[in-house]
Amino acid sequence: ALVIFAIKGCVSSVSQRAEQKRQEELAAMSTQTPTTAPAQKSNSSDIDQNYYQNSAFIGNSFVDGMMNYSLVEGADYFARIGLNVNDAMTKSTSTGTVPVIEELNNGKQYNKIFMIFGENELGWANSDTFVEQYGALIDKAKSYQSTAKIYLFAITPVTKEVSDNNVDNTNNEQIVKYNELIKKLAESKGVVYADVY
């Protein structure tokens, strides 16, 4: 539950950082003598409640946990414990009948799609296969939801004990390498990299 709570905080943090970056980019393009905008009262609870309306979360057990604990209201969840980028093209959710990625072709238009993959792929022999299949998954998501903003989450670190035991390459060194691959993939696909490491 603590990890799920942290992810919810990271989702909000990523959203805030994306908005801050957008504001900085707008500021850089502004005139030398900008006009002062009227003061606006910000209600962060309104932002938090509405930010995830018409959003979809797709991924592994992290997404499954978010769904089970109802941490993000107003979103749809398409998850399966142990799901990886390859299985998302062929396996259904635990309650579904179509492959996970096909759930985005449900007639609903999403504003945002949050994809959480990578941890189950850390032990793959070839990281190029991970990048290739994740890229295909992104392309499929774009084909179904062409106007949605897509976010790729970084893999969160593991405890020192888990990292030191290096079970199936689930260690922080490997996670950092895969996060760099996810970041580069996000750049090449024109989607957002959400650094929650």
Where are the regions that the model predicts?
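Hydrophobic membrane-insertion alpha-helices, especially the h-region
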Residues: 1-8
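N-terminal, intrinsically disordered, polar/charged segments of Gram-positive cell-envelope systems
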Residues: 9-54
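Conserved SGNH/GDSL esterase-like catalytic core that processes O-acyl groups on lipids
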Residues: 43-133
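Loop/turn elements at helix/coil->beta-strand transitions in domains of secreted/extracellular proteins
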Residues: 51-54, 108-113, 145-150, 188-192
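Sec-exported extracytoplasmic/periplasmic mature domains
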Residues: 67, 118, 135, 139-146, ...
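Active-site segments of SGNH/GDSL-like serine hydrolases
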Residues: 120, 142-175
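Charged helix-capping and loop-helix junction motifs
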Residues: 128-137, 175-178
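Substrate-gating cap/lid alpha-helix
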Residues: 160-196
